[in-house]
Amino acid sequence: MKPIDQKIYLASKSPRRRELLRQVGVEFELLLLRENSARGPDVPELVQPGEAPLAYVERVTREKAETASATMLSRRLRVRPVLTADTTVTLDGRILGKPEGDAEALEMLRLLSGRTHQVLTSVALKHLDDFWQVTHTSDVTFATLTEETMRAYSALPEPYDKAGGYAIQGRAAQFIKHIAGSHSGIMGLPLYETTQLLQQAGIRTL
């Protein structure tokens, strides 16, 4: 059996996922959907009727992996394992996606203020017919925020490409009272689970 390539494709437009992979020394190349594009393969991130948060995040991640792998083959790129991930924030079973404007960002902060919510990040690795997937859930507790604080934060650019409308590695770090889980997972790539996944596939991380 031919040894697996130790360099992977990362099919994600998230700069945070790139930083996290570099942190643990994983060699990767970005897999872009189009030439000169910073976007990863497009997969509609629409919640299906009655779909639970866990089922949603795992389905979207799997579809991203399938799309990215097909892109690699159609473009006749060197065959390598493809890594994808998706993060979703949920409160009381409700999925909080990426806010589309000030009003939606403010409403999300009001929901999260003083409450504990869950951040689910699913990671998938696809190599031809082989497929591995893992999902990590973290509990995040927000402090009780003043209306002034929430309005000030929702007016910043920071919330608008983040699930749940906040960035734990940004100014929203000051809102976080307690975390039970993976800090890197909340950022978008749980490093322990990701490296375990890579090792299962035969990719060395040290």
Write out the residue ranges for each language-model feature.
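A short beta-strand-loop structural module common to alpha/beta enzyme folds
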Residues: 28-38
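N-terminal beta1-alpha1 ligand-phosphate binding loop
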Residues: 2-26
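Internal amphipathic alpha-helical segments of the cytochrome P450 catalytic fold
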Residues: 17-18, 30, 183
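Anionic-ligand binding patches
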Residues: 2-6, 48-206
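Surface-exposed, flexible loop/turn segments at secondary-structure boundaries
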Residues: 16, 36-38, 131
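Short, charged, surface-exposed secondary-structure boundary motifs
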Residues: 38-46
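Cofactor-binding loop segments of dinucleotide-utilizing enzymes, especially the Rossmann-like FAD-
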Residues: 13, 33, 128
